[in-house]
Amino acid sequence: MSDKKLDQIRNRIDEIDRQLHELLNDRARQAQAVAEIKKAADPAAVFYRPSREARVLRGVIERNPGPLANETVARLFREIMSACLALESPVRVAYLGPEGTFTQDAVAKHFGGFVESVPLGAIDEVFREVEAAGTHYGVVPVENSLEGMVTHTLDMFTRSSLWICGEVVLPVHQCLMAAGGDPANVRRVYSHGQSLAQCREWLDSHLPQAQRIAVSSNAEAARQASGEKDAAAIAGSAAAEVYGLALLASNIEDDPSNTTRFLVIGREAVPASSSDKTSLLVANPNRPGALHALLEPFARHGVNLTRIESRPSRRSAWDYNFFLDVEGHAEEAPLRDVLEEVRSRAGFFRVLGSYPCPVY
C-alpha cells in the first residue's frame, strides 16, 4: 500500500475521531439537559434507569453491522452511558469487597467505569448500606456455575425489603500473579479456597511443589503476595492492577465455563424492558400437594420457570422457603395473572424484583 493511500486512511480516521468527539460531547450535553428537567420536577429524581439502559444496549447490538463484535460495541456504549450518567448525578454502588474482587468486575460490567464503587466486607453489609441510602445500589454474588448458590445472599432477601434491579453474568477467569516475574521462584500460592480448587489441575502441572494457602478472598491473596518475593496469588486480573503485581499466567482455571451470577439490589422496582425475568420468594402451606399447587399455574399459562431453590425458613424444623426465577415481568401478562394465582395459594409470597435480562 502506498504512503499516499495510508495518509488518506489516517486523515479519514482523524476526521471520524473529530466527529466522534463532537457527538460524544453533544450526547453529554443532552444528558445534562435531561438532568435539569428531572431535578426541576423532583429534587429526589432517580437518574439511573436499568430498563432504559437495557433497551439502548439491545438496540445497539441489533443495529451493529460489524466488524466490531456485539459485545465490544455494547461495552463501548455502556461506558458512554456511564460517563453521561456521572454528569447527571453520580451513582454510588456498594459491593462485596475488598477491592480487586470479581464482584468489583461485575460492578464495572453493569454500571461502567464512572460510578463510585464502595467495597464492603460482607454481603449483609452491602444490603444494609443500600437500605440506609448510603449508596444507590449494591452488587452481591448469588450463584457460581461450579459451586452452586450463595446461600447467604438468598437468606438476606427473607429479611430485607430491597428489590432486585439487575443481573450480571460474569465469566470467571483466574490468573497467577506475583511481585516478581519468574514463576520458578514461586514457593507459596495464596488464594480463596474455591479458587485453589478450581485451578488444582493447573497447579499440579505447573507449580507442583508450591504450598497452597487458602485466605479470605482472592483480593486478600493478591495483597499478601505483593509483599513476598517468593509468593504468588490466584485472582482476577483486576487484582494485579490494584496491588501492582505482574501477571505470570492467565486463564488457569480447570473449567473454562466457570461463571458467576451477581444481583444488583436497590430500593425501587424496575419497569419492564421488553426482555425481563422475575425473582420470587414463596412458602407453601404444610399440606400434601401444596408445592405442586404453587407451580401448576406457571405450566398452565406457559410461563417458563428457570430456577427453583429451597432454603430452610427458620420458622420451624423442616419448613422451607422457595426462591423462583421465571421469565417475564411481574406487571405484564401472562406472568401478572400467574402471580395472582400463586399469591392466593402460597403461605407467603413476595416478588423480589423484575429486571432486564443481561444484554451481554
Task: Please report, for each region that a protein language model flagged, where it lies by residue.
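Domain-level signature for soluble enzymes in the chorismate/prephenate branch of the shikimate pathway
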Residues: 1-360
